[in-house]
Amino acid sequence: MIWDWGFTWKNLYVLSCYIALDLTAYSGTDGQGTGSVSVVDSHFNGVPYAITLSGHDPEPDIILDNLLVENSASVVLVSGGETILPGSTGALYFNSWGMGPQYFNSDGSGARKTGFINPAPNKPTSLLDTSTGRYFTRSKPQYENSSPIIATAHGISNDGTGDQTAAINSLLSSNIGSVIFFPAGIYLAEGTIEVPVGSIITGSGWSQIVAVGAYFYDQTSPKVLIQVGNEGDSGIVEISDMLFTVRGPTAGCILMEWNVHESTQGSAGMWGKMFPIAYGHSFDIS
Protein backbone atom coordinates (compact mmCIF):
# COMPACT_ATOMS: atom_id res chain seq x y z
CA MET A 1 0.00 0.00 0.00
CA ILE A 2 1.16 3.52 -0.81
CA TRP A 3 0.01 7.12 -0.43
CA ASP A 4 -0.82 8.97 2.72
CA TRP A 5 -4.31 7.51 2.91
CA GLY A 6 -6.26 5.79 5.66
CA PHE A 7 -7.11 2.17 4.82
CA THR A 8 -9.71 0.03 6.60
CA TRP A 9 -9.54 -3.72 6.06
CA LYS A 10 -12.41 -5.86 7.34
CA ASN A 11 -13.12 -9.59 7.18
CA LEU A 12 -9.64 -10.42 5.93
CA TYR A 13 -8.70 -14.09 6.11
CA VAL A 14 -5.06 -14.63 5.19
CA LEU A 15 -3.84 -18.25 5.22
CA SER A 16 -0.27 -19.53 4.74
CA CYS A 17 1.08 -16.32 3.24
CA TYR A 18 4.49 -14.80 3.96
CA ILE A 19 3.10 -11.26 4.52
CA ALA A 20 -0.50 -10.14 4.97
CA LEU A 21 -0.11 -6.35 4.66
CA ASP A 22 3.05 -4.81 3.20
CA LEU A 23 3.39 -1.19 4.36
CA THR A 24 7.00 -0.74 3.29
CA ALA A 25 6.40 1.09 -0.01
CA TYR A 26 7.06 4.80 -0.38
CA SER A 27 6.05 6.76 -3.46
CA GLY A 28 5.98 10.20 -5.01
CA THR A 29 8.48 13.04 -4.89
CA ASP A 30 7.95 13.40 -1.14
CA GLY A 31 8.33 9.70 -0.43
CA GLN A 32 4.81 9.25 0.90
CA GLY A 33 4.09 6.11 2.86
CA THR A 34 0.82 4.66 4.10
CA GLY A 35 -1.04 7.06 6.39
CA SER A 36 -3.01 4.64 8.55
CA VAL A 37 -4.35 1.10 8.51
CA SER A 38 -7.19 -0.44 10.52
CA VAL A 39 -7.58 -4.23 10.49
CA VAL A 40 -11.01 -5.18 11.81
CA ASP A 41 -12.80 -8.51 12.37
CA SER A 42 -10.04 -10.45 10.62
CA HIS A 43 -7.95 -13.63 10.87
CA PHE A 44 -4.31 -14.36 10.00
CA ASN A 45 -3.20 -18.00 10.07
CA GLY A 46 0.31 -19.13 9.18
CA VAL A 47 1.52 -15.63 8.28
CA PRO A 48 5.05 -15.26 9.72
CA TYR A 49 5.37 -11.51 9.06
CA ALA A 50 1.79 -10.32 9.13
CA ILE A 51 2.05 -6.51 8.97
CA THR A 52 5.44 -5.30 7.73
CA LEU A 53 6.69 -1.71 8.06
CA SER A 54 9.62 0.09 6.47
CA GLY A 55 11.11 1.66 9.59
CA HIS A 56 11.02 5.11 7.95
CA ASP A 57 9.65 8.07 9.84
CA PRO A 58 6.78 8.72 10.05
CA GLU A 59 5.43 5.22 10.43
CA PRO A 60 1.77 4.57 9.62
CA ASP A 61 -0.81 4.57 12.38
CA ILE A 62 -2.21 1.08 12.98
CA ILE A 63 -5.34 -0.20 14.72
CA LEU A 64 -6.05 -3.91 15.23
CA ASP A 65 -9.63 -4.56 16.34
CA ASN A 66 -11.02 -8.05 16.88
CA LEU A 67 -8.09 -9.78 15.15
CA LEU A 68 -7.30 -13.48 15.54
CA VAL A 69 -3.71 -14.49 14.76
CA GLU A 70 -2.53 -18.12 14.64
CA ASN A 71 0.87 -19.68 13.95
CA SER A 72 2.47 -16.36 13.10
CA ALA A 73 5.88 -15.30 14.42
CA SER A 74 5.29 -11.54 14.20
CA VAL A 75 2.09 -9.54 13.94
CA VAL A 76 3.66 -6.09 13.43
CA LEU A 77 7.35 -5.69 12.58
CA VAL A 78 9.90 -3.56 10.78
CA SER A 79 11.19 -5.28 7.66
CA GLY A 80 14.64 -6.63 8.50
CA GLY A 81 14.40 -5.12 11.99
CA GLU A 82 12.59 -5.19 15.30
CA THR A 83 9.32 -6.92 16.09
CA ILE A 84 6.84 -4.41 17.47
CA LEU A 85 4.03 -6.88 18.23
CA PRO A 86 5.12 -10.51 18.56
CA GLY A 87 2.99 -13.43 17.48
CA SER A 88 2.84 -17.02 18.68
CA THR A 89 2.86 -20.62 17.52
CA GLY A 90 -0.65 -20.87 18.94
CA ALA A 91 -3.68 -18.60 18.75
CA LEU A 92 -3.68 -14.97 19.87
CA TYR A 93 -6.71 -12.72 20.02
CA PHE A 94 -6.30 -8.96 19.85
CA ASN A 95 -9.38 -7.15 21.09
CA SER A 96 -7.91 -3.68 20.56
CA TRP A 97 -4.28 -2.74 19.86
CA GLY A 98 -2.90 0.44 18.39
CA MET A 99 0.18 2.32 17.26
CA GLY A 100 -0.10 6.05 16.69
CA PRO A 101 -0.86 9.40 18.32
CA GLN A 102 -2.99 9.52 21.44
CA TYR A 103 -4.58 12.91 22.01
CA PHE A 104 -5.40 14.18 25.48
CA ASN A 105 -7.14 17.48 24.73
CA SER A 106 -8.86 19.29 21.90
CA ASP A 107 -5.76 21.47 21.48
CA GLY A 108 -3.94 18.54 19.85
CA SER A 109 -1.62 17.79 22.74
CA GLY A 110 -0.67 14.17 23.23
CA ALA A 111 1.98 11.58 22.53
CA ARG A 112 2.64 8.64 20.24
CA LYS A 113 1.68 5.35 21.88
CA THR A 114 2.09 1.69 21.02
CA GLY A 115 0.23 -1.08 22.83
CA PHE A 116 -3.10 -2.53 23.87
CA ILE A 117 -6.00 -0.12 24.20
CA ASN A 118 -7.72 -0.49 27.55
CA PRO A 119 -10.57 0.03 27.84
CA ALA A 120 -11.32 -0.85 24.24
CA PRO A 121 -13.53 1.60 22.32
CA ASN A 122 -17.23 1.11 22.85
CA LYS A 123 -19.13 -0.36 19.91
CA PRO A 124 -22.80 0.65 19.72
CA THR A 125 -25.00 -2.41 19.24
CA SER A 126 -26.71 -0.72 16.28
CA LEU A 127 -23.43 -1.10 14.34
CA LEU A 128 -23.00 -4.80 15.07
CA ASP A 129 -24.22 -8.01 13.47
CA THR A 130 -26.03 -9.61 16.38
CA SER A 131 -25.28 -13.13 15.10
CA THR A 132 -21.49 -12.65 15.10
CA GLY A 133 -20.71 -9.65 17.29
CA ARG A 134 -18.73 -8.18 14.38
CA TYR A 135 -19.43 -4.89 12.67
CA PHE A 136 -22.42 -5.22 10.36
CA THR A 137 -21.70 -5.19 6.64
CA ARG A 138 -23.79 -5.51 3.51
CA SER A 139 -22.27 -6.37 0.15
CA LYS A 140 -22.71 -3.93 -2.70
CA PRO A 141 -25.98 -4.62 -4.55
CA GLN A 142 -25.46 -5.86 -8.10
CA TYR A 143 -29.01 -5.60 -9.54
CA GLU A 144 -28.34 -8.51 -11.86
CA ASN A 145 -32.03 -9.43 -11.97
CA SER A 146 -33.27 -5.87 -12.45
CA SER A 147 -34.25 -3.88 -15.51
CA PRO A 148 -32.73 -0.48 -14.76
CA ILE A 149 -34.05 2.83 -15.96
CA ILE A 150 -31.24 4.45 -17.97
CA ALA A 151 -30.85 8.13 -17.14
CA THR A 152 -29.55 9.15 -20.57
CA ALA A 153 -32.65 7.69 -22.22
CA HIS A 154 -34.78 10.25 -20.36
CA GLY A 155 -33.35 13.53 -21.58
CA ILE A 156 -30.37 13.62 -19.21
CA SER A 157 -26.99 14.46 -20.72
CA ASN A 158 -23.72 12.91 -19.52
CA ASP A 159 -21.39 14.83 -21.84
CA GLY A 160 -20.41 17.53 -19.35
CA THR A 161 -22.63 20.23 -20.84
CA GLY A 162 -25.82 21.91 -19.66
CA ASP A 163 -27.60 21.93 -16.31
CA GLN A 164 -29.10 18.49 -15.59
CA THR A 165 -30.60 19.33 -12.18
CA ALA A 166 -34.28 19.52 -13.16
CA ALA A 167 -34.13 16.47 -15.42
CA ILE A 168 -32.42 14.33 -12.77
CA ASN A 169 -34.86 15.44 -10.05
CA SER A 170 -37.82 14.64 -12.28
CA LEU A 171 -36.47 11.18 -13.06
CA LEU A 172 -35.78 10.37 -9.40
CA SER A 173 -39.12 11.61 -8.07
CA SER A 174 -41.12 9.67 -10.66
CA ASN A 175 -39.26 6.35 -10.32
CA ILE A 176 -38.98 5.70 -6.59
CA GLY A 177 -38.18 2.04 -5.95
CA SER A 178 -36.77 1.40 -9.42
CA VAL A 179 -33.07 0.99 -10.21
CA ILE A 180 -31.86 4.13 -11.99
CA PHE A 181 -28.62 3.70 -13.92
CA PHE A 182 -26.36 6.63 -14.75
CA PRO A 183 -23.99 5.57 -17.57
CA ALA A 184 -20.38 6.67 -17.25
CA GLY A 185 -19.94 10.36 -17.92
CA ILE A 186 -20.22 13.84 -16.41
CA TYR A 187 -23.61 15.21 -15.33
CA LEU A 188 -23.49 18.93 -14.53
CA ALA A 189 -25.76 20.28 -11.78
CA GLU A 190 -26.36 23.97 -11.12
CA GLY A 191 -28.71 23.24 -8.21
CA THR A 192 -29.53 20.64 -5.58
CA ILE A 193 -30.21 17.04 -6.64
CA GLU A 194 -33.02 15.71 -4.42
CA VAL A 195 -32.86 11.98 -3.72
CA PRO A 196 -36.16 10.75 -2.22
CA VAL A 197 -36.45 7.86 0.23
CA GLY A 198 -36.79 4.66 -1.79
CA SER A 199 -34.29 5.74 -4.44
CA ILE A 200 -31.90 3.19 -5.94
CA ILE A 201 -29.09 4.81 -7.92
CA THR A 202 -26.11 3.14 -9.54
CA GLY A 203 -23.41 4.28 -11.94
CA SER A 204 -20.60 2.88 -14.04
CA GLY A 205 -16.94 3.59 -13.43
CA TRP A 206 -17.81 6.38 -11.00
CA SER A 207 -20.37 8.29 -13.03
CA GLN A 208 -19.88 11.93 -12.03
CA ILE A 209 -22.44 14.46 -10.81
CA VAL A 210 -20.59 17.77 -10.79
CA ALA A 211 -21.64 20.98 -9.01
CA VAL A 212 -21.12 24.11 -11.13
CA GLY A 213 -22.33 27.68 -11.25
CA ALA A 214 -23.30 30.66 -9.12
CA TYR A 215 -25.63 28.62 -6.87
CA PHE A 216 -22.54 27.14 -5.20
CA TYR A 217 -20.30 30.24 -5.14
CA ASP A 218 -20.89 31.70 -1.67
CA GLN A 219 -19.18 29.98 1.26
CA THR A 220 -21.19 32.14 3.70
CA SER A 221 -24.42 30.68 2.29
CA PRO A 222 -23.57 27.06 1.43
CA LYS A 223 -25.80 24.94 -0.77
CA VAL A 224 -26.12 21.15 -1.02
CA LEU A 225 -25.33 19.24 -4.22
CA ILE A 226 -26.91 15.88 -3.24
CA GLN A 227 -29.72 15.95 -0.66
CA VAL A 228 -30.68 12.44 0.41
CA GLY A 229 -34.16 12.50 1.91
CA ASN A 230 -35.51 15.05 4.35
CA GLU A 231 -35.00 15.51 8.06
CA GLY A 232 -36.60 12.64 9.99
CA ASP A 233 -36.89 10.26 7.03
CA SER A 234 -36.25 6.53 7.32
CA GLY A 235 -36.39 3.73 4.78
CA ILE A 236 -34.40 2.46 1.82
CA VAL A 237 -31.75 4.36 -0.14
CA GLU A 238 -29.03 2.68 -2.21
CA ILE A 239 -26.31 4.65 -4.03
CA SER A 240 -23.38 2.87 -5.68
CA ASP A 241 -20.55 3.53 -8.15
CA MET A 242 -21.14 7.29 -8.27
CA LEU A 243 -18.77 10.23 -7.84
CA PHE A 244 -19.84 13.64 -6.56
CA THR A 245 -17.49 16.57 -7.10
CA VAL A 246 -17.27 20.23 -8.16
CA ARG A 247 -16.00 22.33 -11.04
CA GLY A 248 -14.82 25.92 -10.84
CA PRO A 249 -15.43 28.35 -7.95
CA THR A 250 -17.72 26.37 -5.65
CA ALA A 251 -16.61 27.35 -2.13
CA GLY A 252 -20.25 27.22 -1.01
CA CYS A 253 -20.87 23.61 -2.06
CA ILE A 254 -21.77 20.89 0.43
CA LEU A 255 -21.38 17.70 -1.57
CA MET A 256 -24.00 15.67 0.32
CA GLU A 257 -26.61 16.05 3.05
CA TRP A 258 -27.79 12.66 4.33
CA ASN A 259 -31.08 12.58 6.26
CA VAL A 260 -32.28 8.97 5.92
CA HIS A 261 -32.13 6.52 8.82
CA GLU A 262 -32.29 2.83 8.02
CA SER A 263 -35.66 1.14 8.49
CA THR A 264 -33.94 -2.24 8.76
CA GLN A 265 -30.25 -2.82 9.34
CA GLY A 266 -28.37 -1.88 6.18
CA SER A 267 -31.40 -0.59 4.26
CA ALA A 268 -29.84 2.82 3.66
CA GLY A 269 -26.27 2.91 2.40
CA MET A 270 -23.65 3.78 -0.19
CA TRP A 271 -21.10 1.58 -1.93
CA GLY A 272 -18.15 2.47 -4.17
CA LYS A 273 -18.63 6.20 -3.66
CA MET A 274 -16.13 9.04 -4.02
CA PHE A 275 -16.28 12.68 -2.93
CA PRO A 276 -13.11 14.21 -4.43
CA ILE A 277 -12.46 17.93 -4.64
CA ALA A 278 -10.41 19.23 -7.60
CA TYR A 279 -10.68 15.81 -9.22
CA GLY A 280 -8.51 15.56 -12.33
CA HIS A 281 -6.91 18.40 -14.30
CA SER A 282 -9.93 19.94 -16.01
CA PHE A 283 -12.07 21.06 -13.09
CA ASP A 284 -10.87 24.68 -12.92
CA ILE A 285 -9.65 24.53 -9.32
CA SER A 286 -6.13 25.20 -8.16
Regions found by a protein language model. Name each.
Residues A184-G185, G198, W206:
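Tight coil/turn sites that cap or link beta-strands
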Residues S170, V179-T192:
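C-terminal, well-structured subdomains that either form a transmembrane helix-short loop-helix hairpin
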Residues F181-P183, T202, V210:
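Beta-strand cores of modular interaction/reader domains in eukaryotic scaffold and signaling proteins
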Residues M1-W3, F7-S178, Q208, A214-Q219, ...:
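Extracellular "leader-to-stem" segments immediately downstream of a signal peptide or signal-anchor
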Residues L188-I200, A211-S240, T245-T264:
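Extracellular beta-strand-rich solenoid/capping regions of secreted or surface-exposed proteins
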